[in-house]
Regions:
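Acidic, proline-/serine-/threonine-rich low-complexity intrinsically disordered segments
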Residues: 45, 62-63, 112
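Catalytic glycan-binding domains that act on GlcNAc-containing polysaccharides
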Residues: 1-3, 7-10, 14-26, 31, ...
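Loop-to-helix junctions at membrane interfaces in multi-pass transport proteins
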Residues: 60, 73-76
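TPR-adjacent "capping" and linker segments in tetratricopeptide-repeat scaffold/adaptor proteins
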Residues: 52-64, 126-130
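Short, solvent-exposed, mixed-charge loop/turn linkers that connect secondary-structure elements
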Residues: 43-52
């Protein structure tokens, strides 16, 4: 997508507007950043496709032993083990069932599992389950009165952690925003934030 956009840009620069327009029109039919920019450049509305999870989730999916294990593990905050069970459950299902599982996880506020199901099922147009507005109250509270838009902070968290609050990178970054312990300590001191005592928080 990127090279096609820049090819059209170069053609426009050289006065070959018809060729450039043809490339941009074709490009804007795709999903992604450059297709959106192509539509914007042409002054056309971007045809955003949003899929909805199909119907009610099957009781065989929610009532099975695999889902019972996931629910139990999530209840006892054994999130990493639950994620492993979830990955096995999702990978063994059809795309329709994966969409239903993504929706089920979304409805349970298991946002990271919802995201995981959309990725496993390549459900790129299931935007609500793929990009849930997770932890919205938390982000509202901590971005209020700051020069950081809430949507930007949430986008960073989604990108960094896929909404898994317990994820830890190989280099030690952790949490929704994937903050390094040293950065957390420095930020607390710089802004005199109360209630922080160690990197485990």
């Amino acid at each position: 997508d990127e090279w096609r956009y820049w090819q059209a840009d170069l053609l426009m620069e050289r006065g070959r507007d018809d060729e450039a327009r043809s490339i941009l029109l074709a490009l804007m039919q795709q999903r992604g950043f450059y297709p959106m920019v192509a539509a914007q450049r042409l002054g056309e509305p971007y045809p955003l496709r949003v899929e909805k999870a199909p119907g009610t989730i099957s009781s065989t999916l929610t009532g099975g032993a695999e889902m019972a294990r996931v629910r139990e593990l999530m209840y006892w905050n054994q999130d990493n083990t639950a994620r492993s069970e979830w990955a096995n459950l999702v990978s063994s299902r059809s795309q329709t069932e994966q969409a239903q599982l993504a929706r089920y996880a979304f409805d349970q506020n298991w946002w990271d599992l919802s995201v995981q199901a959309t990725i496993a099922g390549k459900l790129w147009d299931n935007l609500q389950e793929r990009f849930p507005l997770a932890y919205k109250d938390l982000f509202t509270r901590y971005t209020s009165g700051k020069d950081v838009p809430q949507s930007y902070a949430m986008a960073i968290a989604r990108q960094e952690s896929a909404w898994n609050p317990k994820v830890k990178s190989p280099v030690g970054a952790s949490g929704l925003m994937q903050i390094m312990p040293g950065t957390a300590t420095h930020t607390v001191k710089m802004f005199n934030l109360p209630g922080y005592s160690n990197p485990v928080q």
